Amino acid sequence: MKPLKILISNDDGVFAEGIRTLAIAAASRGHEVTVVCPDQERSATGHGLTLQAPIRAERADELFNEGIQAWGCSGTPADCVKLALNELLKEKPDLILSGINHGPNLGTDIFCSGTVAAALEGTLEGIPSLAVSIASFQWRKFKLAGELALNIAENAINQKWPKKLLLNLNIPPCDSEQMGKPGWTRLSIRQYQEQFSKRKDPRGNAYYWLAGEAVKDLESAGDGPKEWPSDVSQIETNSPSLTPIQPDLFWRGNVNDLPKLN
């Protein structure tokens, strides 16, 4: 295929190994790669935007291979994509990639994910966009994930990427010999046991650390072929999960179940 203009962002920051691996893999295929991502980790910021402070962007080419233009941005992941599309890039990219995230973005966790938000910003602008994550916080072998993400994105572009489609790719933490084939999945519904750790600062004032863990993954009752597994169950089989997402959050239940308006 002809070289693509690719914008890459993330929420783990400009120093993260995942984004560096993805950018280098894309450039090695002959694509024109630009990185615009947070200057430090900004995980779990969702689609937040910076409105009460200026946004600064500094060149960070030295962190990547020759030929890759890079900026570290003081804003959120969504800020980074907005800034890139409206100020930093001379031309609209053909593709936006977000990741490789250092940890999973499965099920309803996507609503908190800065990685998914960066890709969603591209989808809202009508640009083919894919978020890619390793489904483990400890796994640090990113090369296979980068190649798989590029294969899927290039294939989707060759087949004419549907409008308003965001692809969310999660990759199991295993080597290629143990990994199954990628498959289409539905979003699971993740339920957490939320916990706050209450502490006191040196002046005796209380503060809190949020901690929690997923205690239940429910099958979604929403749209999607029923034969598709959930993204969580797909990962549990050591197979990459690919979930099609759209920005339209309109409720699709029975309108007769809605509360009556006075």
UniProtKB/Swiss-Prot annotation:
Signal peptide: none
One annotated GO molecular function: 5'-nucleotidase activity
Annotated binding of a divalent metal cation, by residue: 11-12, 43, 101
Free-text remark on how the cofactor is bound: Binds 1 divalent metal cation per subunit.
Region (Disordered) residue spans: 220-246
Polar residues bias (residue ranges): 231-244
Bias type Basic and acidic residues, positions: 220-229
Keywords of this entry: Cytoplasm, Hydrolase, Metal-binding, Nucleotide-binding
Known catalytic reactions: a ribonucleoside 5'-phosphate + H2O = a ribonucleoside + phosphate
UniProt main location, coarse: cytoplasm
Keyword set includes Hydrolase: yes
Cofactor(s) this protein cannot do without: a divalent metal cation
Gene Ontology terms: cellular component: cytoplasm
EC number: 3.1.3.5
Cellular localization per UniProt: Cytoplasm
Lineage top rank: taxon: Bacteria
Role description: Nucleotidase that shows phosphatase activity on nucleoside 5'-monophosphates.
Family: Belongs to the SurE nucleotidase family.
HAMAP family in the record: SurE
Record-given protein name: 5'-nucleotidase SurE
Origin species: Prochlorococcus marinus (strain SARG / CCMP1375 / SS120)
